Amino acid sequence: EYGLYVIGETNLETHGTWQKLGADGSDEWTLPGARPEWRENVLARTDAMLERDKNHPAILIWSCGNESHGGKTLWEMSEYFRNTDPSRLVHYEGIFWNREYPATSDMESQMYTPVADIKKFLAEHPEKPFIMCEYSHAMGNSCGGITDYTEYAYEEPLYQGGFIWEYMDHGIAVTSPDGKPGFAYGGDFGDRPTDREFCVDGLVLPDRRNTPKMDAVKAAYAPLKITLTDTEAVIENRNLFTDLNAYDLVFASSVNGKPERRAVLRADCKPGGTEHIPFPFALPEAGLACMTVTAIQRAALPGIPAGYEAALGQVWHNYAVARLTLPAPQLVEMDCNVGVKGEGFEYIFGRGKGLVSIRYNGVQLLDDTVRPNFWRAPTNNDEGCAEPFTFAFWKTAGLYARCDNLSAETKGDFVIARANYTLPDGQTLPIDFAIDGAGRCDITMTWQGTRTELPEFGLLFPLRRELTEVSYLGLGPRE
């Protein structure tokens, strides 16, 4: 009724035996492995699940379990599925770690493999289709890179998609001492040792309220891909059975976040097809101009009300900051500093520090030196992988980056100041500041290092405390 494809997985997980004390894959401890004393118990679970669920048409595939390594017993499970119900395929991820019985699974399956490594694996192992039985761990601030995986499913026929771990947070409803409702997890009850928030790893909260992660998933899983140029919407119908005419296509323009014009169109496009639809009106050439196209469900479906926004596409143009035809600002070179001056503004670069001052209309904007930054607050997933320890170098790399060389020159309508930074491990980072006659500054950072696992890549601008107001267009009310 809801159009879900399901893998029915046996209630079997023994990752504590093959990850004993962090040592993966030791047959000495692995269960069930090939131990005869576990065979009857494991096959009983297999039979119980199959008999319970065999008449559910949503189940396309049976799974032997999760994170239980490999061995003969798991292969016998897979054969039981095939012999009892030959209409369905069999899945098991553990054969990636233990190739002793590769026929256990009818498909290749892995967890949390980067897309680049999936491509490499499929180039070397094209014999079976491939799924990611877990590809995004939805704990804390996460799910930011899922489109790398979902888009690859449309590029590579062997790559059949994957599963997010997991749907919901597992927390216990509690009331705090000050009377506020909330959710508790491991460690909140004095339990030691504890896995803390490791079961709070879902797309929705324990009471099923959505999180911003669900918005990211909705966009990645949208039945339509809407790409906008300056003059038209290119709509790829990714539905398997539904025509594009099941949606109202709403074209809406805005300037600086304020609505301007709106039109509703309909178009025909068969499943799997692509339609090019010209804009019904031009994008305004003023301010921060945006064209948004949304696909709105016309008729209610099971679980989907009429009026539901199924997909969205946007294109932006910032006409508010279109370059003025002004001469380059004045470049002033001194022994210790380099200045860039124009009408109402000035920048000062310290030869051993980088950008130290920005003044607009006589007001100093900076409270300290602008510096590169490679660190951010660790997420729950970072902490689960011990990445704060692994990547701690990057915190000090930004704090103690050294500006070894500063050069400046006038090029056309710009003054370009280049600050060359050296990081504590000897890697270099050039940063170019291109300043025009209106005081606008375009910044280009070029990473030249060999290390690629940067937690963040950007600049910190310490602003004066009296600068208390900021105006911006963000990613929406839920971000």
What is the predicted role of each segment?
Residues 1-231, 239-245, 250-259:
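Extended substrate-binding grooves/exosites of carbohydrate-active enzymes
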Residues 218-231, 314-330:
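Extracellular ectodomain segments of secreted/surface proteins
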Residues 230-239, 442-448:
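Short beta-strand elements of extracellular/lumenal beta-sandwich folds
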Residues 232-267, 275-280, 287-298:
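Beta-strand-rich binding/interaction modules
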Residues 255-257, 299-301, 361-362, 465:
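Solvent-exposed strand-loop boundary residues in beta-sheet-rich modules
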Residues 262-269, 275-281, 310-319, 459-461:
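Generic detection of short hydrophobic beta-strand segments and adjacent strand-loop junctions
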Residues 280-286, 318-479:
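Beta-strand/loop-rich accessory regions of lumenal/periplasmic or secreted enzymes
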Residues 283-323:
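Terminal connector regions
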